[in-house]
Swiss-Prot record:
Belongs to the complex I subunit 4L family. This is NADH-quinone oxidoreductase subunit K. Gene3D superfamilies: 1.10.287.3510. HAMAP family: NDH1_NuoK. GO terms for cellular component: NADH dehydrogenase complex; plasma membrane. It catalyses: a quinone + NADH + 5 H(+)(in) = a quinol + NAD(+) + 4 H(+)(out). The chain crosses the membrane at residues 2-22, 29-49, 63-83. InterPro entries: NADH_UbQ_OxRdtase_chain4L/K, NUOK/Mnh_C1-like. Coiled coil: none annotated. It comes from the Bacteria. It is a multi-pass membrane protein. NDH-1 is composed of 15 different subunits. Subunits NuoA, H, J, K, L, M, N constitute the membrane sector of the complex. Keywords: Cell membrane, Membrane, NAD, Quinone, Translocase, Transmembrane, Transmembrane helix, Transport.
Length: 100
């Protein structure tokens, strides 16, 4: 049986990698993937705590987060594709002109 601390350490590492990706990447797709990595890290920690405490509440929360993440993927990719068609780039620095 793997200790819960290993799962939490992996979750923290994945979250940190996602945060680094959000802060350093300039393409919208990579920022989007980094946010998804952060969501999956949160899911891993929820499952780890649910397993440690023997409660199904954490696993239920994971299904809710996965549903929200699927909606985010659909909407986010649609926005990225629309911006790419309009601007011919996915560089987030070039999108500063969308401020209105």
């Amino acid at each position: 049986m793997v200790p819960t601390t290993y799962y939490l350490a992996l979750s923290g590492l994945l979250f940190a990698l996602g945060m680094i990706g959000v802060l350093t990447r300039r393409t919208a797709i990579m920022v989007f993937l980094s946010v998804e990595l952060m969501l999956n890290a949160a899911n891993l920690s929820l499952v780890a705590f649910a397993r440690a405490w023997g409660d199904l509440t954490g696993q239920t929360a994971v299904f809710i987060v996965m549903t929200l993440a699927a909606a985010e993927v659909a909407i986010g990719l649609a926005i990225i594709v629309a911006i790419f068609r309009k601007r011919e780039t996915t560089n987030v620095d070039d999108l500063a002109g969308l401020k209105g």
